[in-house]
Regions:
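Beta-propeller domains
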Residues: 224-421
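Loop/turn-rich, solvent-exposed surfaces of beta-rich toroidal or solenoidal domains
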Residues: 324, 366-503
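Short loop/turn segments immediately following beta-strands, especially the blade-tip
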Residues: 69-78, 121-131, 194-202, 262, ...
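Asp-box/WD-like beta-propeller blade repeats and closely related beta-sheet repeat scaffolds
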Residues: 124-239, 247-260, 269, 295-304
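Blade-loop segments of beta-propeller domains
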Residues: 79-153
Length: 560
């Protein structure tokens, strides 16, 4: 296994208007040589600056998957313009999904291809250029498939959630010698994988309990000898607490098409907490469950009750806080526990997406039910909770204007200040649309509709955790002033495709969000960068599907 970089155009400068291209390669454990080819254009020049990485795939095959590098420096003359596209090869059709939630100086980029069962690792020291530094292939993770989300640790390695079951049906042995029986790729149980900076598998970690879980709640198709809800999607880590949290999504292969039957017992309600004292051998400490709220009793289809499809989790950050949040994709609700280190965390619903809808949508038939809540993040200073909602409301048929997507911000300071004595609980029907009545309930600070009436909406997002000083140097900040979201989920899924825009939002000190209209598409001149375009620096491949987004900074102008 090794890395090789070759300058393909070093002999002579690129012609005017022609991207400068160069390729780095990496030989995977499977013997395949993987490549990353940069296509640098004019906005890539000049001094170091801030960038946005967008991990995307083509809308039509065959065409390469690629990382887009966009100028994210507001006062730059090329703000919002594509500076580079980094195509990966030789395999296409990976279905680019998530990168890590937050980037820190020196971190490598972990980018997952959920359908290709591959994690690509990139070195970002030469931004806006990237070099391939590692690849984790399907053969490297025999006990899990569908790589989803990543958290990078202080040593530069990463934990990744692999939502689907083993490559092959039957028993699978994890790194620590434990064995679980699975029903195959994209099935159950999923796992956690610790990945090295070179893409190597450091540890495959079982997410399922050995004894199994409630078979009535944890359906598996086909059934397993020990039923499991272990289909981890979201992941959050507090190294100071030696804790890792993963939220369970669904047995994914049963929901690959828009007309898939929405079976209640395949919609997960569970959250898994691991002790990561031994980084290569985390111990599953608890499996807890979120419960339906007051709106659920009125929803005839259990799949759309508040507790269903627990897609995302987010941890608080400050030393005095141990709280954790999770959100449900099909249920449209946010839940909280004040102490994630407790032996058996107790979750309470603290916010219903219906309340956010009421700020701009008067139709009282529209609720959080089926609204496809997605990205969830706590600001580094523990003041705000950010949440995106795709807005495709399946119970109401086609995605229409009234079920538009949105991004909203909650002030969570009172809730966290209450500690273990937190009282907030959305348990009355009126609270679903007005917010919790307890004094420590989160306060809805801001809601911005994101009008996407295609088959999807705003799914993933990222916080800008950097601030530029008067000396031109960037340093990390706890006060987030910008967030970005991407309007795309997964091709062919019940969540839909979205309109393929990436939008930037400004955040004031009170947490109020406004669309950054200066972050414009270089072709249309409209706010948000559109990924529906005929040409890219790497060729005329047409529309692309942006999923993961991440703020990064040129190595020479960022300090820890």
């Amino acid at each position: 296994v090794g890395l090789t970089a070759s300058m393909l155009t070093a002999a002579e400068p690129a012609a005017a208007g022609t991207p400068e291209t160069w390729t780095s390669t990496f030989q995977g454990s499977d013997g395949v040589t993987y490549s990353a080819t940069n296509h640098l254009v004019a906005p890539a020049g000049g001094p170091g600056r801030q960038w946005m990485l967008v991990w995307s795939g083509p809308a039509k095959q065959p065409a390469p998957d690629f990382l887009t590098v966009i100028d994210a420096t507001p006062d730059s003359p090329t703000y919002g313009k594509v500076a580079n596209t980094v195509t990966v090869g030789p395999n296409n059709g990976n279905e680019p999904h998530h990168m890590q939630y937050v980037w820190h100086k020196g971190d490598r980029i972990y980018a997952g291809g959920i359908m290709g069962d591959t994690t690509f690792v990139f070195d970002a020291k030469a931004l806006p250029a990237l070099t391939i530094a590692g690849v984790n292939t399907a053969a490297d993770t025999p006990c899990g498939t569908l790589p989803d989300a990543y958290q990078v640790l202080g040593d530069g390695t990463a934990y990744g959630t692999y939502m689907g079951g083993p490559n092959v049906t039957g028993p699978c042995t994890y790194t620590n010698g434990q064995v679980r029986v699975g029903n195959g790729a994209a099935g159950s149980p999923g796992e956690i994988v610790r990945i090295g900076k070179d893409g190597r598998t450091l540890a495959e970690i079982p997410a399922a309990t050995e004894a199994g879980e409630d078979p009535a709640q944890c359906g598996n198709v086909p059934a397993l000898p020990a039923a499991t809800c272990a289909n981890p999607h979201g992941i959050a880590v507090r190294e100071d607490l030696n804790v890792m949290v993963a939220s369970d999504f669904a047995e994914a292969r049963n929901f690959m098409t828009p007309d898939s039957a929405l079976k209640e017992n395949l919609a997960r309600q569970t959250v898994r907490v691991f002790d990561i004292t031994k980084r290569d051998d985390p111990v599953l400490k608890s499996v807890s469950k979120v419960a339906d709220g007051p709106r659920g009793a009125q929803e005839p289809r259990a799949f759309f009750r508040e507790s269903r499809v627990v897609m995302e989790t987010a941890l608080t950050n400050r030393p005095g806080h141990k709280g954790a949040f999770v959100s449900s994709m099909a249920g449209g609700a946010v839940f909280y526990t004040p102490d994630i280190t407790a032996p058996a965390p107790q979750w309470k619903e603290v916010f219903d997406d219906t309340t956010a809808y009421r700020t701009f949508q008067g139709d009282r038939q529209i609720t959080g039910s089926g609204d496809n809540g997605s990205w969830l993040a706590v600001s580094p200073d523990d003041r705000f909770l950010f949440h995106t909602v795709m807005g495709q409301s399946v119970p109401y048929g086609k995605p229409l204007e009234q079920t538009t997507g949105m991004v909203y911000v909650l002030d969570i300071q009172k809730l966290l200040a209450a500690g273990n004595g937190a009282k907030c609980s959305v348990d009355e029907l009126a609270e679903a649309s007005r917010g919790g009545r307890e004094r420590d309930c989160p306060e809805l600070v801001s809601t911005v509709p994101i009008r996407d009436v295609s088959s999807g909406g705003p799914h993933w997002g990222a916080m800008d955790n950097f601030k530029r000083g008067a000396d031109g140097v960037y340093r990390e900040t706890t006060q987030v002033s910008r967030i970005a979201v991407a309007n795309y989920f997964v091709a062919g899924s019940f969540g839909g495709g979205g309109d393929h825009r990436v939008c930037m939002f400004d955040l004031d000190r009170r947490g109020r969000v406004t669309l950054d209209r200066s972050f414009r598409d270089e072709n249309t001149g409209k706010p948000c960068v559109g990924f529906n375009r005929a040409s890219w620096p790497h060729g005329d491949y047409g529309d692309a599907q942006p999923h993961g987004v991440l703020f990064v900074v040129s190595d020479g102008v960022v300090r820890r």
